[in-house]
Curated annotation (Swiss-Prot):
Enzyme Commission identifier(s): 2.8.1.6
Species name: Serratia proteamaculans (strain 568)
Encoding gene, per UniProt annotation: bioB
Alphabetical list of SUPFAM superfamilies matching this protein: Radical SAM enzymes
Protein name, entry field: Biotin synthase
Enzyme class: transferase
SMART domains: BATS, Elp3
Gene Ontology terms for molecular function: 2 iron, 2 sulfur cluster binding; 4 iron, 4 sulfur cluster binding; biotin synthase activity; iron ion binding
């Protein structure tokens, strides 16, 4: 195996500065060395506890500090979550992600969270959670329940971070990633484009991720979804080519990681999404309401997959069950996303 590159902001900036077509060619070349370029990993994300978050993340409609019209909801019952997971599997998802608007989970919540993980795993799906800061014991308990992935985004560069969030330090985020990794859970961590950051900040974010002791297995790259009532509601739109560049640089810097198109995909036309796949994106959230922002409808995703000749990735599970992939490919069912919260409605 080749020696791992220790990335600097300068090196990452050099990639961002490349002519776009050269950058895309390099990213696609790297992508093909590590992945089947036609395969796309498909996940569904459910908000299991919505709103009333004490954090002050300026982009987030779930913060209790902003008036966005979002109605807070308590932690969902375990069976409600499992029913949503069944629908997600039937409609093609191979990974089920559960998100809660907390600074950190409380002890009283842990037994329910463990039951959710165990129940989804029993269906033969991969599991992911995003619950805020974890301590070592909580990470171990989730690992023992069978949690495959834990999402905890760094959001932006260390230098720009304080302009966006003041209630949780950058180091706290890094510490949580370390505890998750130490418990044997795979790491999902990325950031957001469009917060008002510079290209150097985007480079700095990717450097932080790529230089972790083990890079994240999954790197979600979000485009800011501007929600009325949040401090960033009037931010300038992200140039699609700038977003595509970020995807490409992420692919080159973290060649073995899944690079996921996450929030903001509903704002992208088919051509932008196609160029993101060309740049090395190989994971999406499909057929869901992405926490408190909308996501494209399932049939649009399927149509785009067909146009581009892409296939949803088969995931080998403990039951060897790839029935969900077949259902997605054949579009046998129409999704029912009533359980997935959408603050845009």
């Amino acid at each position: 195996m080749a020696d791992r590159i220790h990335w600097t902001v300068g090196l990452a900036q050099t990639l961002f500065d490349k002519p776009l077509l050269e950058l895309l060619f390099e990213a696609q070349t790297v992508h093909r060395q590590h992945f089947d370029p036609r395969q796309v990993q498909v996940s569904t994300l459910l908000s299991i506890k919505t709103g009333a978050c004490p954090e002050d993340c300026k982009y987030c409609p779930q913060s209790s500090r902003y008036k966005t019209g979002l109605e807070s909801e308590r932690l969902m019952q375990v069976e409600q979550v499992l029913e949503s997971a069944r629908k997600a599997k039937a409609n093609g998802s191979t990974r089920f992600c559960m998100g809660a608007a907390w600074k950190n989970p409380h002890e009283r919540d842990m037994p329910y969270l463990q039951q959710m993980v165990q129940g989804v795993k029993a269906m033969g799906m991969e599991t992911c959670m995003t619950l805020g800061t974890l301590d070592g014991t909580q990470a171990e308990r989730l690992a023992d329940a069978g949690l495959d992935y834990y999402n905890h985004n760094l959001d932006t560069s260390p230098e720009f971070y304080g302009n966006i969030i003041t209630t949780r330090s950058y180091q706290e985020r890094l510490d949580t990633l370390g505890k998750v990794r130490g418990a044997g859970i795979k790491v999902c961590s990325g950031g957001i484009v469009g917060l008002g950051e510079t290209v150097r900040d985007r480079a700095g974010l990717l450097v932080q991720l790529a230089n972790l002791p083990t890079p994240p297995e999954s790197v979600p790259i979000n485009m800011l979804v501007k929600v009325k009532g949040t401090p960033l509601a009037d931010n300038e739109d992200v140039d699609p080519f700038d977003f595509i560049r970020t995807i490409a640089v992420a692919r080159i810097m973290m060649p073995a990681s899944y690079v996921r198109l996450s929030a903001g995909r509903e704002q992208m036309n088919e051509q932008t999404q196609a160029m993101c796949f060309m740049a090395g994106a190989n994971s999406i959230f499909y057929g869901c309401k992405l926490l408190t922002t909308p996501n494209p409808e399932e049939d649009k995703d399927l149509q785009l997959f067909r146009k581009l000749g892409l296939n949803p990735q088969q995931t080998e599970t403990e039951h060897g069950d790839n029935q969900q992939q077949q259902a997605l490919a054949a579009q046998l069912m129409q999704a029912d996303t009533a359980e997935f919260y959408n603050a845009a409605l």
